[in-house]
Amino acid sequence: MKKFKVAVLANLKVNAPKFEGMFEDQWDDLDSEKTVNEMVEAIRSGGHDCEFMEGNLTLVEKLPKYKADICFNICEGYYGDSREAQVPALLEMLRIPYTGSRVLALALALDKPMTKRILHWHSLPT
């Protein structure tokens, strides 16, 4: 069996930015250190090299240096309307394969009015 270099990409709750006026549940969709550590250990137990990387701007420098064969992406992102699509966009620019939905699917899913227009165009109920 081929040994892969896998990068687990996630946004940890503990590292999430805090700002005045944020909702109490602002970062409920982010991951715990326990979850990410268990994922990394599960991949390593399969005989693969695996490293966790926080899904933020540091990826721009870290990913090319690590030379991952594939990224296990569970990033939610921190900023912007299409925050969930940001890391996949970076991975596509770097030409690194990744798990999960592609950029367009994520961006559309987060843009409810555009999603409704597309569904309406195809005569699908919303």
Functional labels for PLM-detected ranges:
Residues M1-T99, V103-L104, L108-L110, M114, ...:
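ATP-binding N-terminal substructure of ATP-dependent carboxylate-amine bond-forming enzymes
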